[in-house]
């Protein structure tokens, strides 16, 4: 019997079984009794491994925080960070929208955690990221988007075996940065799988500052730098005429850097200054920097951070033995947990493969899509994302259902938004960085709630 057939039979049995089993049964081995230094909370947490390839012993690590209140009536949301190769546990759960943030030896409550509105599932993917591992190091080589999407699909299938009462729950997939590749490709596989075995109740995807189309996303950086006064007129001309950013990245990863691109990027780097955080151009920087979020989107600036003015509390916390024991986590083949993988050899040229066309197919299939942008991010600027969404709406023949306007959060302008055909949405988040939930937690929560509810963003206080 093939693994797929076995899974299908297992799901049928579980659906029947889950009708008679209460949620109390979920006090299984993955339950987190209490994280070290954690404040008292009323929701359940789980973490552990799901094997995605029994033969090769490849396992993905997850952290699951149920909703603070009424988890049985709230949707399931999968969160994926990008990189490729950066941790959804360290960046997403413990620095952005999860229930806690490390502060010295303790955890403090995130007052704008997304598990106020949903059951949040964070996945360290692909294998080789964070606590996710393979027993054979050769499996870290040549990893690409297709392998990652396939493993993520198998993860979800098998995760439902652990949590059967979430099988029919509304499911949303969210993420940021290179998750602009991860999220649409996973959603596409889910829709294909559902044609034969209806398993996933996919209700929408939301991606923040996403890599969707190589040239448009990357080349919008020049205009962003120039419009924010970070480069001169002459450098802007060089950056748009002689060597744009997509050409630079392409040459960089092919190991064939031209003298022209080297000269242009040297001038751009000199003018923008290494003391300006490209992920949040308004943020004052400190040394040392904190959390590396991206290798692909900024190859000459590996090591930039979520917040460069804060000590790396997350790395210290997740490398504590007592924390790893509480999370049921293991270090396999590595000496320490890192925010972004040092062992993963990802096929970085996959960044050149557009995923905006997959987003279009999802929209045509009736899956609501939200693309949102922190407006202080110069790495994947809002201008590129806005252009791509507008262009896609035109290609699909979608008319504007919510004209471009401001939206509000906490009696302040939260950003701007436009909706096409009540299924494709674009929104900016005012004052937000590449990592929107980190830099603007309240506004990101308002955005998240509206997305889950299927409502337009608030147009008044």
From Swiss-Prot:
Glycans are attached at residues 168, 244. The keyword Cytoplasm does not apply. Keywords: Carboxypeptidase, Disulfide bond, Glycoprotein, Hydrolase, Protease, Secreted, Signal. One of its GO terms (biological process) is proteolysis. PROSITE patterns: CARBOXYPEPT_SER_HIS, CARBOXYPEPT_SER_SER. It is found in: Secreted. Disulfide bonds join 86-340, 243-261, 286-309. One of its GO terms (molecular function) is serine-type carboxypeptidase activity. Ubiquitous. The keyword Kinase does not apply. The active site is at 177, 377, 434. It comes from the Eukaryota. It is an enzyme of class 3 (hydrolase). Residues 1-24 form the signal peptide. Its EC number is 3.4.16.-. One of its GO terms (cellular component) is plasmodesma. Probable carboxypeptidase. Belongs to the peptidase S10 family. This is Serine carboxypeptidase-like 45. It comes from Arabidopsis thaliana. The lineage of its organism: Eukaryota, Viridiplantae, Streptophyta, Embryophyta, Tracheophyta.
């Amino acid at each position: 019997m093939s693994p797929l057939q076995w899974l299908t039979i297992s799901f049928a049995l579980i659906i029947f079984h889950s009708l008679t089993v209460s949620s109390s049964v979920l006090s299984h081995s993955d339950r987190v009794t209490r994280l070290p230094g954690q404040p008292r909370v009323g929701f359940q947490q789980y973490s552990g491994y799901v094997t995605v390839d029994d033969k090769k012993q490849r396992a993905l690590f997850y952290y699951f925080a149920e909703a603070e209140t009424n988890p049985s009536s709230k949707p399931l949301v999968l969160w994926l960070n990008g990189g490729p190769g950066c941790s959804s546990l360290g960046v997403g759960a413990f620095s952005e929208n999860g229930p806690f943030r490390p502060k010295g030896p303790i955890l403090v409550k995130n007052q704008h955690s997304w598990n106020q509105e949903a059951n949040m599932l964070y996945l360290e993917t692909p294998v080789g990221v964070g606590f996710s591992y393979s027993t054979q190091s050769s499996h870290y080589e040549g990893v690409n988007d297709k392998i990652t999407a396939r493993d993520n699909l198998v993860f979800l299938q098998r995760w439902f075996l652990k949590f059967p009462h979430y099988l029919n729950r509304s499911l949303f997939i969210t993420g940021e940065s290179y998750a602009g590749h991860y999220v649409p490709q996973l959603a596409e596989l889910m829709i294909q799988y559902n044609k034969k075995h209806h398993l996933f109740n996919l209700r929408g995807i939301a991606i923040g500052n996403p890599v969707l189309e190589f040239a448009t996303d990357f080349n919008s950086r020049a205009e962003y730098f120039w419009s924010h006064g970070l480069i001169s007129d002459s450098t802007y001309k060089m950056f748009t005429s002689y060597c744009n950013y997509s050409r630079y990245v392409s040459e960089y990863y092919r190991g064939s850097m031209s003298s022209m691109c080297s000269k242009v990027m040297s001038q751009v780097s000199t003018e923008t200054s290494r003391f300006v955080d490209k992920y949040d151009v308004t943020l004052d920087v400190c040394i040392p920097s904190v959390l590396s979020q991206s290798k692909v989107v900024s190859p000459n600036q590996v090591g930039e951070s979520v917040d460069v003015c804060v000590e790396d509390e997350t790395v210290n916390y997740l490398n504590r033995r007592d924390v790893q024991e509480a999370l049921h986590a293991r270090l396999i083949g590595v000496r320490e947990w890192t925010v972004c993988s040092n062992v993963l050899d990802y096929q970085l040229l996959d960044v050149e493969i557009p995923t905006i066309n997959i987003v279009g197919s999802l929209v045509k299939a009736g899956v609501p899509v939200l693309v949102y942008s922190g407006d202080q991010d110069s790495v994947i600027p809002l201008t590129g994302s806005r252009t791509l969404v507008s262009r896609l709406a035109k290609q699909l023949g979608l008319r504007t259902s919510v004209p471009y306007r401001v939206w509000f959060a906490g009696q302040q302008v939260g950003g701007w938004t436009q909706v096409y055909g009540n299924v494709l949405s674009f929104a900016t988040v005012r004052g937000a960085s590449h990592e929107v939930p980190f830099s603007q937690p309240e506004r990101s929560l308002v955005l998240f709630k509206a997305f889950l509810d299927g409502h337009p963003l608030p147009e008044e206080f």
